[in-house]
Regions:
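Short, surface-exposed tryptophan/glycine-enriched loops
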Residues: 159-183, 341
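Noncatalytic regulatory segments and standalone regulatory/sensor domains
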Residues: 38, 43-49, 53-87, 91, ...
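Conserved active-site-adjacent core of cysteine acyl-enzyme catalytic domains
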Residues: 91, 100, 284-440
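Active-site-adjacent structural segments surrounding the nucleophilic cysteine of cysteine proteases
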Residues: 191-310, 438-441
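Residue-level detector of short, conserved catalytic/binding motifs and their immediate flanks
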Residues: 110-112, 116, 126-128, 186-188, ...
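A short beta-strand element within beta-rich, extracytoplasmic domains
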Residues: 107-120, 355
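Secretory targeting and sorting signals
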Residues: 1-34
Length: 441
């Protein structure tokens, strides 16, 4: 099981500099191992539905399509829910749902992360679930991957604990097969809820998922240059360290806010690229929050997972971006070569990394789970990052940093499996998928 499942992913953890021996132990010990690293296939596939024609391919129950969004039509039933983080009262909701076609991956997969973009007026919320064909030929149960609402007027957004069985479990936001088990298909269901008798409705504009079957390797070779050398995107730098102690009810404040800080940086970038399009919160939304960079505090409050007790739920972050008309989803990339294609297209990435203090030169810290923004590449192919940890210095000026390409690839690809948030306006096209590779965006 990959380090991506360590759910202290959004908290920095200093590592003693004497950990050199442990780092050395990760290095290849033979030519055979090095060859294995080069040849190991990284199976990743992503698929989404985001248009009227896409949604027509699925099965609707109590939902209808207006424009390119799903919404509740004539409800198919009702559901009673007691918010475990609310006042303890039970509310009854009208329900509609949409179920995707069955997706066959073509390989045995062991992890799946879903994505959705939805707007949820007060009194409404959505739930994502998945089922699939197990390696023994049986169909799995439905696993709940998240209950989402923009604010807390409806429910407190949350992952759902204690869903494990002999096939798989849900690790916060990720379906994870048990050791020695796998699945070969997946099928998503998004359920839409509104208070019974209300005429309001959530609207869902994107439903998708990434499934992966990855080799168990500890080190990868640096990937070939991908053509983005010398390109740097103007992503604004925000330091999570500035927010130490802010709103400790949200996972003890800014020290743990790497994910929403990174997401806020990408939203800030798109706001600068397209002024007036509303690709982020308005000043009135965060006017009462603690300065500076109050939009970071706002992002933290609005990505917070009440079960996980943290702001590092991956699809909650991309769903937050989706509130503002951006398209956001979670996938895995196979290499920095693939990441370069996004930079060439003008799209920064948020990526999940993990490393000991001496494994990423210039970071100045170690972490068992962290997120940062890839904003470009130097002429020689090293990574230009906006690292919200900012060398543990509470200063936005310390956020931009250049990291060695080979080192960066090895704290990203083998550790989180190459997790990336892809956030972009519909008007900015994604780059083409790599020819001959399974489509992972």
């Amino acid at each position: 099981m990959h380090v991506s499942r360590v759910h202290a992913r959004s908290t920095l953890a200093l590592v003693a500099t004497g950990a050199l021996a442990a780092a050395t132990a990760l290095a290849p010990t033979s030519a055979a191992l090095a060859k294995k690293e080069v040849s190991a296939v990284r199976h990743i596939v992503y698929q989404q539905w985001d248009s009227a024609s896409d949604f027509a391919a699925g099965t609707a129950s109590g939902t209808t399509v207006v424009g390119d969004t799903l919404r509740i039509g004539t409800p198919s039933g009702q559901f009673s829910y007691t918010d475990p983080f609310g006042a303890g009262t039970t509310a009854t909701y009208d329900v509609g749902s949409w179920t995707s076609p069955v997706v066959t991956t073509g390989f045995p997969y062991t992890e799946l992360v879903s994505s959705w973009n939805a707007k949820t007026p007060p009194g409404t919320w959505v739930q994502m679930s998945v089922r699939g064909l197990a390696d023994n030929g049986s169909t799995s149960k439905d696993y709940i991957l998240g209950r989402w609402a923009e604010g807390t007027e409806s429910i407190h957004r949350t992952s759902v604990p204690v869903q494990g069985d002999d096939l798989a479990s849900v690790a916060i936001d990720t379906l994870v097969a048990k050791k020695g088990r796998s699945l070969s298909t997946w099928q998503l269901t998004v359920s839409l809820y509104r208070l019974a008798g209300s005429s309001s409705t959530p609207t869902v504009s994107l439903v998708g998922a990434m499934a992966s079957g990855l080799p168990d390797v500890k080190k990868v070779n640096a990937s070939p240059l991908g053509g983005a050398e010398g390109i740097e995107l103007a992503v604004p730098p925000y330091s999570q360290e500035i927010h130490r102690g802010h709103y400790p009810e949200f996972n003890n404040g800014g020290e743990a806010w790497c994910s929403p800080t990174s997401t806020a940086m990408v939203l800030g970038y798109w706001q600068q690229q397209f002024p007036g399009q509303g690709y982020g919160p308005a000043p009135a939304d965060y006017a009462d929050l603690i300065p500076p960079d109050q939009w970071v505090d706002y992002a933290a409050a609005n990505t917070y997972d009440w079960n996980y007790d943290g702001t590092g739920n991956w699809p909650f972050n991309t769903a937050y971006a989706g509130r503002y008309g951006l398209e956001g989803f979670v996938t895995r990339l196979r290499s920095l070569t693939e990441a370069e294609q996004f930079i060439k297209a003008g799209i920064p990435l948020v990526v999940s990394v993990s490393f000991k203090q001496n494994e990423l030169t210039g970071a100045g810290y170690g972490t068992n789970g962290h997120l940062m923004v890839i904003r470009g590449f130097t002429p020689s192919g090293d990574v230009i990052a906006n690292d919200p940890a900012s060398h543990l210095d509470p200063n936005d000026a310390s956020v931009r940093v250049v990291y060695n390409r080979a080192e960066f690839e090895n704290v990203w690809i083998p550790k989180s499996g190459g997790i990336a948030y892809v956030i972009h306006p519909e008007s900015v096209s994604l780059p083409p998928n790599v020819p001959g590779a399974e489509p992972n965006w």
